[in-house]
UniProtKB/Swiss-Prot annotation:
MF term (GO), any: hydrolase activity
Organism expressing this protein natively: Bacillus subtilis (strain 168)
Keywords: Hydrolase
Protein name, as recorded: AB hydrolase superfamily protein YclE
Domain AB hydrolase-1: 30-268
Disulfide bond entries: none
Active site: S95, D232, H261
Length: 281
């Protein structure tokens, strides 16, 4: 099997990158962005398969309305899994990709051994986003709030200059909400990442707003790991997930106390220890 390449799926060139050996972990999102988040140590312990979905892939044809449907994305993931001859995978979704990961496990349960969901809220509704914003304003330090206000002021001009990368610009300008500690070079994580904005807009803006992960967890029987950052103000507060405690015995919830939206990058040792323990169970 090639360690990197392209899988052609329904008019999209989906990139993949494979690192390490062992039990397969299928990481949904960008094959450029996500390998940068995880430590070299944990990437040696398992077979990490980083794959694009069509929101991060250049289309080979004109976009159609159905290209933004979640079931089309799930079909891409299944096509990639078949193409790479992967079996019995742990499927991993971070942030909005957690919705994709759990939906894939619900749709293709025979192909999934475990599910890992990181740094997401149970839904992406406007009401939940307002709660997250209120939590930030009520609990964040004055220094953090000032830094966010300063950074976000530059977002409109970033988008004016490069509207097709507005998703990336929003992620970069929200750094004060994303990281426990300031990371001056965090923008480099997004270097070379293509964004297919019509698809991202539909999924993040509409589809994920209608999905309640707390309810969908009842539909899967395989083990689920939910990893959260205490200072992840993008999807705060972590108490949004309190309902899983005692309700779902197949779900393990872990809160990383000195992390924001990327605990695998911010607390690599604690992350690796916790995640490896769960993977090896």
């Amino acid at each position: 099997m090639e360690r990197a390449g392209i899988c052609h799926s329904d008019g999209f060139d989906l990139a993949y990158r494979i690192e390490g050996e062992g039990a397969p972990i299928l990481v949904i999102g960008s094959a450029v962005y996500y390998p940068r988040l995880f430590s070299s140590d944990i990437k040696q312990k398992y077979q990490w398969v980083f794959v694009d979905h069509r929101g991060f892939a250049k289309p080979k044809r004109e976009l159609r309305a159905e290209d933004s449907r979640l079931d089309a994305v799930l079909a891409d993931i299944e096509r990639m899994r078949t193409f790479l001859q992967l079996e019995d995978v742990t499927i991993l979704g971070h942030s909005g990709h957690a919705f994709m990961a759990l939906e894939y496990a619900r749709t293709y349960p025979k192909q999934v051994r475990k599910v890992a969901l990181f740094n997401t809220a149970p839904d992406n509704s406007e009401e939940r986003q307002r709660k997250s914003e209120s939590f930030f304003m009520e609990t964040a330090s004055l220094e953090r709030k000032k830094r966010f206000e300063k950074d976000i002021e530059n977002l409109p001009q970033d988008i004016d200059k490069d509207p097709e990368r507005r998703f990336v610009h929003m992620c970069i300008r929200a750094e004060a909400k994303s990281f426990y500690q300031e990371r001056p070079h965090a923008a480099a994580l997004w270097d070379g990442v293509f964004t297919n904005m019509p698809i991202i807009d539909e999924l993040w803006g509409n589809t994920f707003a209608r999905i309640d992960l707390l309810q969908r967890l009842a539909d899967v029987r395989m083990p689920v790991y939910i990893g959260l950052g205490r200072y992840d103000y993008l999807v705060a507060p972590v108490s949004l997930w309190d309902a899983v405690d005692g309700l779902y015995p197949h779900v393990d919830k872990v809160i990383f106390e000195k992390s924001g939206h990327q605990p695998m990058l911010e607390e690599p040792e604690a992350f690796d220890q916790s995640f490896r323990k769960w993977l090896d169970q």
